[in-house]
Amino acid sequence: MSFVTENPWLMVLTIFIINVCYVTFLTMRTILTLKGYRYIAASVSFLEVLVYIVGLGLVMSNLDHIQNIITYAFGFSIGIIVGMKIEEKLALGYTVVNVTSAEYELDLPNELRNLGYGVTHYAAFGKDGSRMVMQILTPRKYERKLMDTIKNLDPKAFIIAYEPRNIHGGFWTKGIRRRKLKDYEPEELESVVEHEIQSK
């Protein structure tokens, strides 16, 4: 490794790459642990420690120049962003989306069910009168698509999304993994719903 330490630019590049990899694994492991994916987190921690042992010894012993210190700090921050982006792309787990709507005529529950979503809905009452509340469980990778779909169907809907800590029983655990959502674009739904309302 002497050829690395003797070349200052190569040293800077090495510090950056090693620290990005190390902090990426560290960030992913922390997120996965919090989400309850213990075995995946353990596998990621193996890679994290491997990078630490192989690379960080070299890095830490060469932080005697200002460019190396700045590169180390920059690599650390980039590693956090990369780790979070990877976790977002993997989209592990599920999201619960609660929707409150005043538009009963839209028949949102059946519209969403026809697209492949599992929907539980019930009547509720707020300051401005009766409302329909829907609870929808969806894999995280479909969360953005579901949000866009609801906004196109009912732009005034009140939407809250959160990740459940534990799920047990009912349609959710048995059906959601087998259920496949229809291939559609959320923007296409607005004109369809408007046409249905006008035809009533």
UniProtKB/Swiss-Prot annotation:
CDD domains: YitT_C_like_1. It is a multi-pass membrane protein. The keyword Mitochondrion does not apply. The chain crosses the membrane at residues 8-28, 40-60, 66-86. GO terms for cellular component: plasma membrane. Pfam families: DUF2179, DUF5698. Its main location: membrane. It is found in: Cell membrane. Keywords: Cell membrane, Membrane, Transmembrane, Transmembrane helix. The keyword Ion transport does not apply. Belongs to the UPF0316 family. This is UPF0316 protein SAB1848c. It comes from Staphylococcus aureus (strain bovine RF122 / ET3-1).
